[in-house]
């Protein structure tokens, strides 16, 4: 309900009909953080059947007067977000960590990685994917650079970012600590990959396209919680 757009207080009102003594909105928020972190121990280690292109992009946030960034990497075929992180700065080390996670999730399937024109991506992709350089002519990937101001960026990842922006700007707790913001965004990634259906992939979730053998039940959140405990 939370990631679908319902506020914590609206969820509280709903739960009071069933559990009046255990439904304060602060308790609900702690559940969201707890289970997002719990499920991520499972989902962060899954491998997917991807296409041949990944797209990486960043979103700027201002939290408590500071500039922060949400960086995500999407498989353009299945729409599956293969890696993401909420961070204080776009350092080479931070970006490399996210792209390495994308490489781990997709294995050797990727041929193209598309990014914007941010300086430093060449170094990041060299570290994470072995990008071809003057000294390494056996690179398995091509770095496709798209300058947003010149040609526009990929509408698939732009739609994802519009969805995230619309939701996070009103989220209670998102503007608190870095750890809470990171957990909330991890939950958003899980919701996007495993729960939310997409018209662009015939009404399926990205996980149904990318991990068809997973075969989740109707209550996908509960299913993922149980799987993360095994």
Question: Which role does the model predict for each range below?
Answer:
Residues 1-54, 58-64:
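Short, positively charged, Gly/Tyr-enriched micro-motifs
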Residues 11, 28, 57, 79, ...:
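Mobile genetic element proteins and their domesticated derivatives, centered on retroelements
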Residues 33-34, 84-106:
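Active-site beta-loop-alpha junctions of metal-dependent nucleic acid enzymes
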Residues 56-72, 76-78:
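An active-site-proximal beta-strand-loop segment
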Residues 109-122:
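Acidic/histidine-rich, metal-coordinating catalytic segments
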Residues 118, 129-162:
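Conserved beta-strand -> loop -> alpha-helix junction used to position metal-binding or nucleic-acid-contacting
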Residues 158-177, 195:
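Active-site proximal helix-loop segment of RNase H-like, two-metal nucleases, encompassing DDE(D)
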Residues 173-174, 178-230:
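C-terminal domain-tail junction helix/linker
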